[in-house]
Swiss-Prot record:
Record localization: Cell inner membrane
Protein name: ATP synthase subunit delta
Membrane topology summary: Peripheral membrane protein
Record keywords: ATP synthesis, Cell inner membrane, Cell membrane, CF(1), Hydrogen ion transport, Ion transport, Membrane, Transport
Organism (species): Parabacteroides distasonis (strain ATCC 8503 / DSM 20701 / CIP 104284 / JCM 5825 / NCTC 11152)
PROSITE patterns on file: ATPASE_DELTA
Length: 180
């Protein structure tokens, strides 16, 4: 069977059960922490696929990766996945669950990169504008990237607006080099 198909089935089953028990938000938080753990700690994947690491140790690792206090449904789900020897699919399951949750709750991720730190009033104003435009709840993350020189880079779902000085200067340079 396909990795995506199996992962999707596990994620959909977990989402359905969490929704029935009205714990989908709590499981969402735990799955976000798990997904972040996989991206920040590449060794976690290796530890899960290592046959020398016992199942109870893997449970401890995944519980710690889920956050300080994980919900019972998350813990039971982790035990189920490990019992069926599907631990290598956990990163995919986490990402699919997060996607299902955001789709259900109409949450749009927005990434706002600037060359210098922006005050909270500007972020709040932008968040309100985007909420009105999209009709969705906005999950906002802002990052400072000095290499932009000035301006900003905004990513909303699959759309990207690059109004950075670095990009504008690169485009001017490319244009000048082509017209020699």
């Amino acid at each position: 069977m396909d990795i995506g198909t199996i992962s999707s089935r596990y994620a959909k089953a977990l989402f359905s059960l969490a929704k029935d028990k009205e714990q989908e938000s709590r499981v969402y938080d735990d799955m976000k922490m798990l997904a972040d753990s996989f991206s920040m700690e590449p060794e976690l994947r290796g530890a899960l696929s290592n046959p020398i690491v016992s199942v109870p140790e893997k449970v401890k690792l995944l519980t710690a990766a889920g956050g300080i206090e994980v919900c019972e449904l998350y813990s039971r789900f982790i035990n189920l996945v490990l019992a069926h020897k599907r631990e290598t699919l956990l990163p995919f399951i986490a990402y699919i669950y997060i996607h299902l949750y955001r789709k259900e709750k109409k949450i749009t991720r927005v990434r706002f990169d600037t060359a210098v730190a922006v005050d909270d009033a500007v972020k709040s104003h932008l968040q309100d504008k985007l909420r009105k435009e999209t009709g969705c709840t906005i999950e906002f993350s802002g990052h400072v990237e000095p290499e932009l020189i000035g301006g900003f880079r905004l990513r909303i779902g699959n759309y990207r607006i690059d109004a950075s000085y670095a990009t504008q200067l690169r485009d001017i340079r490319t244009g000048l080099l082509e017209n020699r």
